[in-house]
Every structure is written in structure tokens, then in C-alpha cells.
């Protein structure tokens, strides 16, 4: 025999950190596979240890970890998992970060500040990641920080289709909470039949995080059902002020729609006490039972992530998942 033929069969493996294993289980279920068994625990001093219980040699590995609080711990655990996979000879390693930590630190607002979103990308690459898969980055330019392919998925169709099924589209106005997300609002409008778009002019002090001053509403919202859209809800200050501003301008109803439910600090109380009739989010982050309330709707992001993983594994196309029109 003059040649040795190797098996060309590819092996897809899903791995999960401890931040949100329920999401990873849902993704694996959509793919019809199980999660690779992993041992992970903290030493007494807080250091993280990870070991995979099965061979990963030659596998196409997808490491799912949402960067929920405590953010730094979840990121470090994912980095350690990537390093372990690299040293165990995984063929390709894809970081799946449904919520990408430090995404708001994507540029320097003033001198002597870091660009932490870039540092994150460098850390993943150094650890051994070949590819990055994320959902609704705070700003799209973060894709350029990673030296390799980036699959930037959009939850917009999922959110828009849900909202569109609940309201009279002829009475709908899509509202951006600031001028920076008007383009996203326009894409919502396209998906929902060309409904009007408005935005709220606001100012923010770069020295005071999580605080903004809501200004005037730009656009006609009188008698309309308004959908305030954003990529995340952190302390909910911006978005609840937007709700108040819309009602002050004569809006008939307001729905809040956002991808990432960070829900820090006073967020739950603010949302519970807001005049919005419904808050719609995706499960890119875990939402504890105590943070759930009447009027909160949580949509599953697992089918979108599973579809993207399948396309990447099978060398298919994920373009429709990038452009937000899937």
C-alpha cells in the first residue's frame, strides 16, 4: 500500500462554562447532540480549574459562555477552556459569546483610557481561539478587533417578528433611545413593513457610567404604539426615561425590546414601575427567577446560535444571520 488514508469525518463538539449551562443545553438539543462532559471548579483562592472528560483531539469545538456577572470570572473560565482545548489538539476552536463582555469599551472617550473590547479579542486569540461567534455587539466595529473570522449574529428578526405578531403594524413606530441606533431602528422598520421611525435625543456624561439625560423626542409618536429598541438593558435608566418621554409626547402604548437582559442594580424595579406594557428580551444571559416579573417576555436565542454553529461546522453560509433578515 503506497498511501495512508485518514478518516475525513468531522466531529462537532459543544462545551459550556458554568455561567449559563441551560443555554448551551438548549443549543445542543437544537443540534441533536449532547454537551461534552467537563469538570470545572474553583480552588480555595478563586483560581479556576477545567478538565474535559472525553478526547477532543481533531474536533470542531464550540465553547459557549455568556459573560454574565461576575463578568471577569466567566471570561477567565472561557479562556482557560480554550487553552485546554488547544493543548488537547482540538482542530478548530470557536468562541461562542452570546453576550460579549466589555463591548461598551470599544473606543477611547478621553485620554489615558483602555480599549477593553480590543483587549478581549486579543485574549481570545492568544488563548487559542480560531473563530468568534457573538450576538448583537454593542458596536459593529468590534468585529475588526479579532484576528480571524467573526460571526456577528442578529436577534433583530426574532424580536421584530414577535412584536409584529402582537400589535397593529399600521399604528406602530420604532423608537431608537438615541441617535446612534437609528440605523437599527430603520432595519426594524424594514422588517415590519416600513413603519415610521423616531429617536430620542439624549446626552451622557462620560465620567458618570450608567447615567444619561433624556431629551426631546424626534419624530411623530402621537397616538402610536411605540417600540423602544436597544442592544441591552443594564440599569434600565435610559430606556425607562425614554418610555416616559414617549408617553409625554402622546404615545398610546410603549413596548421595550432589547437583546441582552443585563439587569444590573435598580433595573428590575425601574422596569416593574415603568409605564411600558411589555419588556421583550432574549436569553443571551441568565435571568434568575427573582428577576422575572409580569410583563417580561424572554425569547430563546438557542435556535439562532444552533443554526449558525451548524452552518459553520458544515462550511455553509451564515450571511443571512449577519444581515438581520433571516
Tell where the protein language model's regions lie, with residue ranges:
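PRPP-associated nucleotide enzymes
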Residues: 1-326
Amino acid at each position: 500500500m503506497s498511501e495512508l488514508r485518514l478518516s475525513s469525518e468531522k466531529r462537532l463538539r459543544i462545551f459550556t462554562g458554568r455561567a449559563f449551562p441551560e443555554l448551551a443545553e438548549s443549543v445542543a438539543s437544537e443540534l441533536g447532540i449532547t454537551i461534552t462532559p467537563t469538570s470545572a471548579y474553583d480552588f480555595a483562592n478563586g483560581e479556576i480549574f477545567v478538565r474535559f472528560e472525553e478526547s477532543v483531539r481533531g474536533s470542531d469545538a464550540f465553547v459557549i459562555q455568556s459573560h454574565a456577572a461576575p463578568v471577569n470570572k466567566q471570561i477567565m473560565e472561557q479562556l482557560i477552556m480554550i487553552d485546554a482545548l488547544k493543548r488537547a489538539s482540538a482542530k478548530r476552536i470557536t468562541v461562542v459569546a452570546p453576550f460579549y463582555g466589555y463591548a461598551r469599551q470599544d473606543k477611547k472617550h478621553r485620554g489615558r483610557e483602555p480599549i477593553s473590547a480590543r483587549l478581549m479579542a486579543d485574549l481570545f486569540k492568544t488563548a487559542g481561539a480560531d473563530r468568534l461567534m457573538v450576538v448583537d455587539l454593542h458596536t459593529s466595529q468590534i468585529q475588526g478587533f479579532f484576528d480571524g473570522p467573526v460571526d456577528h449574529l442578529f436577534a433583530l428578526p426574532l424580536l421584530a417578528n414577535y412584536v409584529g405578531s402582537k400589535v397593529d403594524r399600521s399604528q406602530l413606530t420604532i423608537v431608537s433611545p438615541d441617535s446612534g441606533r437609528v440605523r437599527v431602528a430603520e432595519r426594524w422598520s424594514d422588517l415590519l413593513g416600513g413603519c415610521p421611525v423616531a429617536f430620542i435625543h439624549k446626552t451622557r456624561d462620560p465620567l458618570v457610567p450608567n447615567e444619561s439625560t433624556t431629551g426631546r423626542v424626534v419624530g411623530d409618536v402621537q397616538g402610536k404604539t411605540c417600540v423602544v429598541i436597544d442592544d441591552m438593558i443594564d440599569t434600565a435608566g435610559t430606556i425607562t426615561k425614554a418610555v416616559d418621554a414617549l408617553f409625554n409626547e402622546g404615545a398610546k402604548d410603549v413596548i421595550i425590546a432589547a437583546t441582552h437582559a443585563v439587569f444590573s442594580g435598580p433595573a428590575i424595579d425601574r422596569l416593574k414601575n415603568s409605564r411600558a406594557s411589555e419588556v421583550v428580551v432574549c436569553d443571551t444571559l441568565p435571568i434568575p427567577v427573582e428577576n422575572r416579573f409580569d410583563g417580561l417576555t424572554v425569547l430563546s436565542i438557542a435556535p439562532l446560535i444552533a443554526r449558525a454553529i451548524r452552518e459553520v461546522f458544515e462550511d455553509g453560509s451564515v450571511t443571512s444571520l449577519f444581515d438581520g433578515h433571516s
